[in-house]
Amino acid sequence: MAENTSDGVIAPFLFMAIFGPVGGTFYKAVNTMDSMIGYTNDKYILFGRTAAKLDDVLNFIPARISGCLLTLAAYLLPGADGKNAWRIFLRDRRKHASPNSAHGEAACAGALHLRLAGDAWYFGVLHKKQFIGDNDREIVPEDIWKASLLMFLAEGILMVVLLMILAAVR
């Protein structure tokens, strides 16, 4: 959820706000291609790599904005820790093979005092990955609700900012 805040919501809204519906649709098409075939396998190596690299370029700014929005949301959300969100965001935002994936994860992990990511299985193969955040406590089901609230608040902040910009330019 923390990673998908950027590519699932923040980035599409930014692309629609700047480039209109065509921009939002273009962004989602590239993002979906990356999700579906962006893996480096023999069948889709050239097309998949192109989709993955284009997705990296398109998400470069939105991922960083998402990390900042999630951090700001952590300052506003009762029970979340904005100071720790900022600390972990700055420390761990580059702990991922993708240049963009860890920004939101780091802010969310810090806000909720969680450790996210780590080793993962893909197509039956274990991939060693770094952890994001500190292992302050066990993850509990309520953390899903807290992460959702953090995401919704970050999205709400973005909407307010975009509406203020829209009102100012009209």
Q: Which residues are covered by each model-predicted region?
A:
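Hydrophobic alpha-helical transmembrane segments
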Residues: 1-30, 35-170
